[in-house]
Design a protein with these regions (language model features):
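Glycine-rich cofactor/substrate-binding loops
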Residues: 1-30, 90-91, 272-484
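Generic, well-ordered alpha-helical scaffold segments in large soluble proteins
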Residues: 34, 38, 55-62, 83, ...
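A helix-coil-helix interface module used to build multimeric assemblies
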Residues: 1-185, 191, 199-203, 264-268, ...
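Charged, flexible cofactor/metal-binding loops and thiol motifs
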Residues: 110-125, 136, 150-304, 309-329, ...
């Protein structure tokens, strides 16, 4: 046996051992499955299998803290082997047959990540549902929409908020589509060219609830792209949430006063009694930055020749921790959205004097006066400048003045049409095309998103049941064998 230098233990094995709490349970499942595969292949006797499974089931009953995961012994697989040797004797060495240590840990990683992908997709569905519920509730709540933090056009808080649901749905669908590749088996890969023992790779895959074996054994052992894609989708999921969090912090400021965060989302200042710091939003923003950094790190590690373990050694813990963080952030934003207090009167008052009707006024001049849009734009710009001299927003009189000043006939503009320009709800009700801000359109969009989230939940449930059933069946079969 090779001696482990203190330097290698501290810098290398300790890094891997730190991931034991994450992978311990999945390693138990992977080892039990491999022991049963060895029995099915006739590689070990029934008696030895019973002894080995007895030790593995004992190991399965223990938390990782009670297993001697010690970097002075080696990495996780070596520590587990030593634990089993001490427990059941030399038969523990049978787990090496037909399988490398990397196959064991990569199987465990896939078992962990496949569940995390499903859980994160479930969390995404809950966020979509929360956004849709609040969007329907506020489909009539007037507010100015902004670009560059400048008032652009009248909208509703419901229409604004709903714009954050579609990106969540897209990322959720990307996560679920990548689950197919994560939920594939590396069992039977052998060292480099296949296993001489585990020949029925399809059976080995199904025993663990994987949908199929990854066909090329070298690709199976060294592929990184499914994990990178999952991490990318988790990062873009939180990036979209960061955008909403950034906006909410601005809208919750005293200067805007559009909304307040619920008490469960804020942290009081220890010095200044009046302050309600939006702590939840800081957590969302900071966590997104962490995930961007972790994604960048994993991409950098993948830039290597093929068949290099460092692409995985530094992913075993980082990837599950990152997916867990993305789930925590998503659940946090869901809570924030549910508890938001919307100040409708303040939002509506922000439209007054903001000139958000200007583009509609220019379009009206196009229709009524036969102007091209550039000329109509200049007329309305002149009206805005004229009104600004008195520090106010434009009115019908300002538009009339600008038309006359520009040499156009204001009588061509119908008075009732001009009055409607200054009714923000009337303008919003006119936006009935697909994706528009009309309340009925917003409600319909939210309904479609809710249906899509429900469909996702149904598909997730089937995948979850398949994985849990396979793992449960493995444990039942192992216990029955031991009890014979």
């Amino acid at each position: 046996m090779f001696d482990v230098s203190p330097e290698l233990a501290e810098s290398g094995y300790a890094w891997e051992i730190a991931d034991a709490p994450i992978l311990h349970n999945a390693l138990n499942i992977a080892d039990i499955a491999h022991a049963l595969d060895l029995l099915d292949a006739g590689a070990i006797s029934r008696a030895d299998t019973q002894t080995l499974l007895g030790g593995l089931l004992h190991l399965e009953s223990l938390p990782s803290s009670e297993v001697n995961y010690d970097p002075s012994i080696g990495e996780m697989v070596t520590c587990r082997e030593q634990f089993l040797v001490d427990l059941v004797g030399p038969v523990a060495g049978s787990l090496r047959a037909g399988r490398t240590r990397r196959e064991a840990v990569r199987t465990a990683l896939r078992l962990v990540v496949r569940q995390q992908v499903l859980a994160l997709t479930q969390d995404s569905c809950a966020l979509i549902e929360a956004i849709c519920a609040r969007s329907i509730e506020h489909s009539h709540s007037l507010m100015p929409d902004y670009t560059y933090l400048q008032p652009a056009q009248a909208s509703t808080f419901g229409h604004y908020l709903l714009s954050f649901a579609d990106p969540v749905l897209r990322d959720a669908n990307r996560l679920l589509s990548e689950h197919v590749h994560v939920n594939s088996s590396v069992s039977g890969s052998g060292g480099a060219n296949g296993s001489v023992i585990i020949r029925d790779r399809m059976r080995a895959a199904h025993n663990l609830g994987f949908n199929k074996p990854i066909e090329h054994v070298r690709d199976a052992m060294w592929q990184t792209d499914p994990f990178l894609h999952v991490l990318f989708s988790a990062t873009t999921l939180t990036l979209g949430q960061d955008r909403l969090a950034e906006d909410l912090e601005i809208f919750a400021s005293r200067e805007f006063g559009f909304l307040s965060l619920g008490n469960s989302s804020v942290r009081p200042s220890v010095l200044m009694p009046q302050k309600r710091n939006p702590y939840a939003l800081s957590v969302i923003r900071g966590s997104t930055g962490i995930l961007i950094g972790r994604l960048t790190g994993q991409l950098a590690l993948s830039k290597a020749p093929s068949a290099r373990s460092d692409t995985y050694i530094y992913a075993y813990g980082e990837l599950p921790r990152s997916l867990a963080l993305a789930g925590q952030v998503t659940r946090l934003l869901t809570s924030v959205v549910r508890d938001l207090v919307v100040h409708e009167a303040r939002m509506k008052s922000a439209i007054e004097g903001s000139n958000t009707e200007a583009a509609d006024a220019a379009h009206l001049l196009m229709r009524s006066c036969g102007l091209d849009y550039l000329t109509a734009h200049r007329v309305i710009r002149a009206a805005i400048t004229h009104a600004a001299e008195d520090d106010r927003g434009i009115s019908a009189d300002d538009i009339t003045w600008a038309l006359i000043d520009g040499g156009f006939d204001p009588e061509q503009v119908e008075a009732d049409e001009l009055d409607e320009i200054f009714d923000p709800m009337a303008l919003i009700q006119s936006r009935k095309s697909i994706g528009g801000a009309a309340p009925d359109t917003v409600t319909a969009m939210a309904g479609s998103l809710l249906a899509a989230a429900l469909d996702l939940r149904t598909r997730l449930g089937a995948e979850q049941n398949n994985s849990e059933s396979a793992e449960s069946h493995l444990l039942i079969r192992a216990r029955e064998l031991v009890q014979e």
